[in-house]
């Protein structure tokens, strides 16, 4: 995915993106962002989906190891790709049920993957648009490397849909890098990688990586409250949120 010509064409427009705040996809291809580019280009859409599946593999183990899913009941993976992450969660927590939501073209291969993982009977696959709504009734909603793809307005729109679905006792888990407020001296390799990804999101989708304060602010805009941030052994953190009016013990 990273070495595909489409990436290099858009990254060549970095100066334009930094100067205007607009995506290279809009400048080069006349599409708002890379996601619409994926929909219009079947070849690159397949490359992107395969790349995101690999990315899910690299983060799923770290997420499962760092978070206690045992009391969630129903886990809804919003923008969950072809199901690698929800499969890993369900394998590690046999008592849970899952729902996988992503675009119909993305989840087309999910039933086979879930069957191979031995969890197909415990996971419903839903082809849909997270901007139109998300399935209700979950105890835990996960968005992994989803929110960083969007600007604040679109991120809040997705989070608001999750808030409507989550009820008063559910939780939301964002699997994302968390940038430091400031960097003094030489940044660590992880921070350097996160900052590079921040630029990548600007170029490709108009999204961005965010600090703890920025997560707190746009969660509040969606009637959610930042509960805690959990470190993992991988490159991402777990940003856990609850309904704004929930008690600390919810």
Please provide the spans of the model-predicted regions.
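Conserved Class I S-adenosyl-L-methionine-dependent methyltransferase catalytic core
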Residues: 1-74
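Alpha-helical subdomain
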Residues: 65, 69-250
């Amino acid at each position: 995915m990273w070495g595909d010509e489409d990436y290099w064409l858009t990254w060549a427009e970095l100066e334009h993106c930094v100067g205007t705040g607009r995506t290279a996809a809009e400048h080069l291809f006349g599409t708002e962002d890379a996601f619409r580019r994926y929909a219009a280009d079947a070849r690159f859409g397949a490359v992107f989906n395969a790349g995101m599946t690999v990315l899910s593999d690299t983060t799923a183990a770290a997420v499962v190891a760092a978070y206690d899913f045992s009391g969630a009941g129903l886990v809804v993976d919003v923008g969950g790709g072809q199901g690698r992450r929800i499969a890993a969660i369900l394998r590690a927590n046999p008592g849970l049920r899952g729902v996988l939501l992503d675009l119909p073209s993305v989840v087309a291969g999910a039933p086979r993957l879930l069957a191979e993982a031995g969890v197909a009977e415990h996971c419903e696959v839903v082809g849909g648009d997270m901007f139109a709504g998300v399935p209700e009734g979950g105890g835990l909603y996960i968005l992994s490397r989803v929110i960083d793809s969007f600007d604040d307005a679109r991120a809040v729109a997705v989070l608001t849909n999750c808030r409507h679905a989550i009820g008063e006792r559910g939780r939301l888990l964002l699997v994302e890098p968390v940038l430091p407020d400031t960097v003094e001296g030489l940044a660590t390799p992880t921070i350097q990688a996160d900052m590079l990804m921040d630029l990548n999101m600007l170029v490709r989708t108009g999204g961005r990586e965010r600090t703890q304060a920025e997560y707190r602010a746009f969660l509040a805009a969606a009637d959610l409250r930042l509960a805690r941030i959990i470190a993992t052994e991988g490159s991402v953190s777990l940003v856990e949120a609850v309904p704004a009016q929930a008690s600390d013990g919810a």
